Amino acid sequence: MNNSSELIAAINGFRNSGRFCDINIVINDERINAHRLILSGASEYFSILFSSDFIDSNEYEVNLSHLDYQSVNDLIDYIYGIPLSLTNDSVKYILSTADFLQIGSAITECENYILKNLCSRNCIDFYIYADKYNNKKIETASFNTILRNILRLINDENFKYLTEESMIKILSDDMLNIKNEDFAPLILIKWLESTQQPCTVELLRCLRISLLSPQVIKSLYSHRLVSSIYECITFLNNIAFLDESFPRYNSIELISIGISNSRDKISINCYNRKKNTWEMISSRGYRCSFAVAVMDNIIYMMGGYDQSPYRSSKVIAYNTCTNSWIYDIPELKYPRSNCGGVVDDEYIYCIGGIRDQDSSLISDIDRWKPSKPYWQTYAKMREPKCDMGVAMLNGLIYVIGGVVKGGTCTDTLESLSEDGWMMHRRLPIKMSNMSTIVHAGKIYISGGYTNSSIVNEISNLVLSYNPIYDEWTKLSSLNIPRINPALWSVHNKLYVGGISDDVQTNTSETYDKEKDCWTLDNGHVLPYNYIMYKCEPIKHKYPLEKIQYTNDFLKCLESFIGS
């Protein structure tokens, strides 16, 4: 006999005929014949049981009445070479029995079956099971499935069996698959209603309160399972004092604006989190050296060069909600390039740059209010400049560094308010062409050029400016020097990507605040040779935001699921 399967079949034949059997597994009134040696070889539990003082060597029976007979019988058949026949109903019993008997291969087979068949119809059931039996692999997989399908599950009959501890974990998770934070209170209310359990402050703390619409906050106030709890009403009365919340991963789209790898058009790319890739969603004719500003989910591109050798005064825009281009926007007062763009609650600002007629530097700051027919001059910088960093923070326009007369960099930092210009602490080094972002109450800049004379040295510097203390802090440098990179912030993390050169254009980096270091980010790799001008997190908008509050607003909100 030279085949192990034939050997196993022969031994199973001995068991079926009772030959050489030396142990009986007793479960209530049922008995299962077996061989100690075979059971010990497959099960750590039986190996310890039969090789210790737990059972006398002459003892012929082992009582396992606390276990499920069918599961034990199936597992002993499995030990003797008969494949497991698994179903969604049986696999939990067999897995917990295999775990008790410590049959490793059966455990793996059951886990693989569950992972393969995990879906929205069974994820809650498997999550509750895995939590009970402390199976972290199944618990993690089923929990992630719950997060992905949460809006489908709120009407599932098993939804009410989730514990408050589980709901706190679900509602707190950044990966909760909702495209608008208003759906989080809906999830909470549906669970409260299905369990008839009163709300707690711990549950309310899981909501990103600062991101909720007034209509949903009113709905929380008025719901009987919330309003009847004094502590909950007290919490809601003090939400104005809560810190600003970060959006969940799926409530925003990461949109990049740049020049396509063929370098013949502007490309709008969207980051696909499932595939960890950037996908082009739209494009138009070539343009470069333009300013970018984002207002109400519309990306505005101002000035720059098109396919002619002349600078442009045109302003075009891309609406991320309708996935369409907008061309009927008033032109700038005159053609310009290498300018900066920022927005406040009402206006879009175009700052500085280079004029088309004589390539002279510009000091003008022009602004436009959407729906108005023209741009108007708002102010003038103290010194004409281009390729500077610009930022809007606490209602002030900050202008950082840039290229001034003579083609040299400057180290100035100044802010503009209704009262005029104010000088601040200078940069540690003269810089231009850097990326700029406001993050956690500070201004961050990265990359660009650094030189006190001719602009020619590519930088990997990263600096942060604290407006409260009027001070600059040098952070860990980028791994790769970058010119005009895109700098963006998502979920309290900083990222930088792209470069306006032919080298390493498809790399991005992420900043670890605790370790003060930048690491190459494999999750946001750009298309090859794609020049990223700007990257913006775009918050999803829903028609419900325009709906007036009513007593059944949450039901109205539920009708938008899937839209």
Curated annotation (Swiss-Prot):
Q: Which InterPro entries match?
A: BACK (IPR011705), BTB/POZ_dom (IPR000210), Kelch-typ_b-propeller (IPR015915), Kelch_1 (IPR006652), SKP1/BTB/POZ_sf (IPR011333), Vaccinia_A55R (IPR024182)
Question: Which Cys-Cys disulfides exist here?
Answer: none
The Kelch repeats are found at 252-297, 298-346, 347-395, 397-441, 442-492, 494-540
Source species, domain of life: Viruses
GO annotation, biological process: symbiont-mediated perturbation of host ubiquitin-like protein modification
Q: Which SUPFAM superfamilies match?
A: Kelch motif, POZ domain
The record ties this protein, via PANTHER family, to: KELCH-LIKE PROTEIN 32, LD33804P
Q: What is this protein called?
A: Kelch repeat and BTB domain-containing protein 1
Q: What is the documented function of this protein?
A: Probable substrate-specific adapter of CUL3-containing E3 ubiquitin-protein ligases which mediate the ubiquitination and subsequent proteasomal degradation of host target proteins.
Task: Look up and give the organism this protein is from.
Answer: Ectromelia virus (strain Moscow) (ECTV)
Predominant location:
host cell
